[in-house]
Swiss-Prot record:
One of its GO terms (biological process) is peroxisome proliferator activated receptor signaling pathway. The gene is FAM120B. This is Constitutive coactivator of peroxisome proliferator-activated receptor gamma. The keyword Isomerase does not apply. Interacts with ESR1 and RXRA. Interacts with PPARG; in a ligand-independent manner.
């Protein structure tokens, strides 16, 4: 993440850039300097997931109760010293960073393959050096933090820009994260999450002013340096020959630095001693070998400019207007609030700021002049840029979706409605297991019905509505382009209600309509009565299990027993007891089953939000319904043929509930002509009859 090689360079060659600080002391100093103000830290949550996930077990699907406790302790520690935390999550992938996103996903695929190879050969979880965050962690962390009373925001563009903007505009104490881009932005101080000691509240502050002193640069030079070294916008190889030329003419090569370190020093010297001589006189393309990449390069440099900031590397021409592919977003919880810097209300808004490069580049400026949505054609800045066409035209509905997205109250809904493009990162799935399909395929029909609901899909099975671009990771998908997925017709008794009805209506009976719509997304309208009779929080679980077992015909009765038993036993079980649970061994199939269930819960977040929230969000949060190790234990026991009484640990009330929930799921599956039978009735290595070849889905 961030600038290529900069983290290692700072750690090895510029240790004085890193200073140990104490958050309690910083907060006290901030209060004395700003009486009445609350010391606030902006947290780049995506950078912190690995730090927050402290449970020892990570391969079984997630230790969600332990994780929730870890988050609660993190929040409590900062609250105790009077520090307010604002959490930001990535809400979208910018087009200029899509290639980098794909590269990381393919790299993650290789890491996951190694994890499953290890599990199969050792029958145990790999060490922390192979750690991979549990599926759905980022999504559920948002809701966990909100449940803990924290202000949690989801970005409308790359989160690091919004984090830096918020810190810059609100005089924050600092940014907490792990991304060298925060050394490049001219914003509030940057603190390392990986160096944080929660016991003492000590961490490391990385000082961009000291970095500039070491490199002989000014703060305004750092965006230029970042792009010449390579970052998430500019591929590292783009200026490889240029960096080599800088290195060959660099006279002060340090033996204490590795080659990458000397390259950084050489490029910095070239900026300070060669390029700066012509700053303000020559355009960048006259001083650098930009070639056909000049628009992308200008865009990369400008992407570090926060609201109101200018770059001395852009020749000032007041008549020229730079239009950056970026928008400044309202960071306030009140979408109507007025701020010092105007706020763009939609992705079509154009923001203009006279930072004055040559108009042929037509980059976007990080500022807009009003909050009106302007329906004007975007200027093409090259093949890497993509204009997001708003798919939903009802401005009130789009405004509601946007507000819910920013407040981290929904998942994927606004992305579908505003750009028609969604993504889902890697899951712990075994690419060699032909019997279990990827979660991307299992839940695709649900997503298709949601697309129909959100985009107004027509009838006749596969809709003629606009296709949604899906960047979902699954085995065999090279991610060279998105899958084009058409909406699928909804079958709802009485017809499909409008989004205005589902989201805005207060009429009596609307809650029943919302539930009907949710069940129709899972194609389970016929089982409404049975599912409604189930007590909370098991309604959502049963809905998910029925859908799973209908979709995946390689699931058996033993799997159902394990899913139900772990959900029942989880209720009231102390967190420490879950943490102390020991497993005989790790089964790769159980790992993937856990992934299927957890990804089902994230799908429920999408569906529930799209349908106007007929169910309370808490009913399908994993810390209420799922524990990875507990499920794994029940799976291993069920495989051995343990009775229901043993599976639910001899708890009489659990035995009754177990049979009730099992009956509901089996009866609902029976209506879909899907009997659930024991594995003992199968022939060896039963692979199921459904085919999940990627190409059949691409036809959509």
């Amino acid at each position: 993440m961030g600038v290529r090689g900069l983290h290692g360079f700072v750690a090895s060659s510029c240790p004085h850039v890193c200073t140990v600080v104490n958050f309690k002391e910083l907060a006290e100093r901030h209060r004395s300097q700003h009486p009445g103000g609350t010391p606030t830290i902006v947290v780049d949550a995506m950078c912190c997931l690995r730090y927050w996930y402290t449970p020892e077990s990570w391969v079984c699907g997630g230790q969600w109760r332990e994780y929730y406790s870890s988050l609660r302790e993190f929040v409590r520690t900062f609250t105790a010293v009077g520090i307010k935390l604002i959490f930001f999550f990535d809400g979208m992938v910018e087009q200029s960073k899509r290639d980098e996103w794909v590269k990381r996903r393919l790299k993650n695929n290789r890491e996951i393959a190694k994890i499953f190879h290890y599990i199969k050969s050792r029958r145990e979880q790999p060490g922390r050096n192979m750690f991979f965050i549990p599926s759905g962690l980022a999504i559920f962390t948002r809701f966990a933090l909100k449940a803990l009373g924290q202000e949690t925001l989801c970005s409308l563009q790359e989160a690091d820009y919004e984090v830096a903007s918020y810190g810059f505009q609100n005089n924050c104490l600092g940014i907490l994260g792990e991304d060298t881009d925060y050394l490049i932005y001219d914003t509030c101080p940057y603190f390392s999450i990986s160096e944080l000691s929660l016991d003492s509240l000590d961490t490391v502050m990385l000082c961009r002013e000291k970095l500039c002193q070491s490199l002989g640069l000014h703060l305004a030079d750092l965006p230029l340096l970042a792009c010449l070294l390579g970052n998430d916008v500019i591929p590292e190889g783009m200026f490889e020959s240029f960096r080599y030329k800088c290195l060959t003419s660099y006279a002060s090569v340090r033996e204490s630095c590795d080659r990458k370190g000397n390259v950084i020093l050489a490029v910095a010297e070239h900026i300070s001693k060669v390029l700066r001589l012509h700053q303000g006189e020559k355009k960048l393309e006259e001083m650098l070998p930009l070639g056909p990449n000049k628009a992308l390069f200008y865009k990369g440099v400008a992407s570090y400019l926060l609201p109101g900031q200018k770059s001395p590397w852009f020749i000032q021409k007041p008549e020229d207007v730079v239009t950056l592919d970026k928008q400044v977003l309202s960071m306030s919880s009140d979408p109507e609030s007025k701020q010092e810097f105007p706020v763009c209300m939609d992705s079509e808004s154009k923001q203009k700021l006279p930072v004055g490069t040559d108009p042929e580049f037509n980059l976007e400026a990080p500022m807009c002049t009003n909050t009106e949505v302007k329906q004007e054609d975007p200027v093409n800045v090259g093949p890497e840029a993509k204009h997001q066409v708003t798919v939903v035209l009802d401005p009130e509905i789009l405004k509601v979706a946007r507000a819910q997205h920013v407040q981290a109250e929904s998942y994927l809904v606004y992305s579908v409605m505003s750009s028609g493009e969604v993504e889902c990162s890697n899951s712990l799935e075994d690419a060699t297991d032909q019997a279990l399909p990827s979660q991307a395929f299992v839940y695709r029909p649900v997503r298709q019905r949601v697309y129909s609901l959100l985009l107004g899909g027509g009838g006749g099975g596969s809709s003629t509505g606009p296709a949604v671009k899906e960047w979902f990771v699954y085995s065999g998908n090279p991610l060279r382009q998105p899958d084009l997925v058409r909406p699928l017709q909804m079958n709802i008794p009485g017809g499909t209600p409008s989004l205005r009805q589902l989201w805005l209506s207060q009429e009596p009976g609307i809650q029943a309509q919302r539930l009907d719509t949710l069940l129709a997304c899972f194609d389970l309208s016929s089982s409404r009565e049975e599912l409604q009779a189930v007590e909370r929080p098991f309604q959502a679980l049963c809905c998910l299990l029925v859908y799973l077992f209908v979709q995946v015909d390689t699931l058996c009765l033993e799997d159902l027993h394990a899913f139900i038993a772990q959900a029942l036993c989880l209720q009231g079980k102390p967190t420490m007891e879950l943490a102390d649970l020991q497993l005989d061994h790790i089964d790769p199939r159980a790992v993937q089953l856990a992934t299927l269930l957890v990804r089902g819960l994230t799908t429920l977040v999408l569906v529930n939000g799209a349908c106007g929230s007929p169910w309370e969000m808490a009913d399908f949060m994993p810390w209420h319904l799922f524990d990875g190790k507990l499920f794994h234990q029940k799976y291993l026991q069920s495989e051995k043929g343990y009775t229901a009484e043993v599976l639910v640990e001899q708890n009489r009330s659990h035995v009754t509930r177990f049979h009730t929930l099992k009956s509901v799921v089996c009866k609902a599956c029976g209506k879909e002509s899907r009997p659930i039978v024991s594995r003992r009735h199968w022939r060896p290595h039963h692979a199921g009859s459904r085919q999940y070849e990627p190409d059949q889905w691409r036809r959509y």
